[in-house]
């Protein structure tokens, strides 16, 4: 009916982001690669969202969102694994159920100047256990986005109203296992936003299974605890951002840590923004560090369209072999202790 239509709405939305990219030392052999990559400034996506006014200050909503690849049109079998939630909202805050970003990540990742996309992004939420921390032959039992505490399935989350600048979010992801608790997630954040100042602290715990060796010769319970502090201060002329993070793994009878830090500064320039960010990743298990510096510029052509460019340099020390994240460009980690430089120039359009 007309009344029903007036009380509810459904929106189709998306982003297409494609860039020309180049990365040197793209593998251990020292080869370079260039071509098109996707999601250099924002993740390309397609989704549907809607709300219904239930009256009495209560609103129902849904959000379905999947990733697309702007460079080749592939979707890897389109699904809604970026987000698939149903929610109830009111004066009490918001309750959501389904799969989405964990509450803690959704808040503290906002202090990354490069928005967790492209070669400039802060890499603290990397799935470290499947890479260097417990040996390159190891893999975890869930997708990377889940093992790194970025997203969780089967999750109930709650977001509070704003209390004079203070907000909080909590999430619990069920493991849905008859035995053990692999896949269980619990985490949350508290934040304070007031004018130019923004501060947040978050904690996550993810229960996994670590598959040991190639071929798999055994498995072990793996817990990842991540504690993150983030903040920003807007001075109008420039804005300062910072992240301090520790990821602690408990597996194989040992405890290993990865300490990650980021410090960034951004400044408006005409219709665009210049941003500079330095990050350091201290990988305790292999007693190695990596230094990561990125410079970017985004120029807004309209409210929905922008062009951008990013230059990023990863300086690996000792046994570290972290690689820049140029999605859909065939890159990996360089040789251990080898550096890597990347460039992305692209267009982002939202609808």
Identify the meaning behind each predicted range.
Residues 2-6:
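Sec/Tat signal peptide C-region and signal peptidase I cleavage site
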Residues 7-22, 33-175, 182-184, 191-198:
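Outer membrane beta-barrel
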Residues 8-14, 52, 56-60, 91-95, ...:
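Outer-envelope beta-barrel architecture signal
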Residues 13-21, 63-65, 98-100, 169-173, ...:
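Transmembrane beta-strands of outer-membrane beta-barrel proteins
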Residues 19-23, 67-71, 102-106, 175-177, ...:
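Structural signature of outer-membrane beta-barrel domains
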Residues 187-300, 310-313:
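Detector for outer-membrane/organellar transmembrane beta-barrel domains
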Residues 335-351:
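Outer-membrane beta-barrel "beta-signal"
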């Amino acid at each position: 009916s007309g009344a029903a239509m007036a009380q509810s709405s459904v929106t189709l939305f998306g982003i297409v982001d494609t860039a020309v990219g180049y990365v040197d030392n793209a593998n251990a052999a020292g080869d370079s690669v260039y071509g098109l990559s996707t999601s250099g400034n924002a993740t390309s996506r397609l989704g549907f969202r809607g709300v219904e006014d239930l009256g009495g200050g209560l609103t129902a909503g849904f959000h379905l969102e999947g990733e697309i690849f702007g460079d080749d049109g592939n979707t890897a079998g389109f699904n809604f694994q970026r987000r698939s939630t149903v929610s109830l909202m009111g004066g009490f805050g918001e309750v959501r159920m389904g799969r989405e970003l964990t509450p803690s990540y959704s808040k503290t990742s906002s202090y990354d100047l490069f928005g967790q996309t492209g070669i400039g992004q802060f890499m603290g939420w990397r799935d470290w256990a499947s890479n260097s921390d417990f040996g390159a032959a190891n893999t975890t039992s869930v997708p990377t986005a889940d093992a790194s505490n970025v997203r969780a399935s089967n999750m109930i989350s709650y977001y509070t109203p704003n209390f004079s600048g203070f907000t909080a979010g909590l999430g619990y992801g069920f493991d849905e296992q008859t035995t053990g608790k692999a896949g269980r997630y619990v985490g949350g954040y508290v934040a304070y936003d007031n004018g130019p100042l923004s501060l947040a602290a978050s904690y996550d715990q993810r229960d996994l299974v670590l598959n040991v060796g190639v071929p798999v010769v055994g498995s072990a319970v793996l817990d990842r605890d991540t504690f993150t502090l983030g903040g920003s201060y807007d001075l109008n002329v420039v804005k300062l951002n910072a992240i301090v993070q520790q990821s602690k793994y408990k597996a194989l009878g040992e405890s290993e840590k990865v300490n990650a830090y980021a410090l960034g500064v951004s400044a408006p320039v005409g219709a665009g923004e210049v941003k500079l960010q330095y990050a350091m990743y201290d990988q305790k298990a292999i007693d190695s560090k990596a230094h990561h510096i990125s410079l970017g510029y985004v120029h807004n052509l309209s409210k929905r369209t922008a062009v951008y460019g990013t230059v990023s340099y990863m300086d690996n020390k000792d046994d570290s072999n972290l690689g820049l994240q140029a999605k859909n460009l065939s890159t990996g980690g360089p040789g251990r202790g080898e550096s890597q430089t990347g460039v992305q120039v692209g267009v982002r359009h939202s609808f």
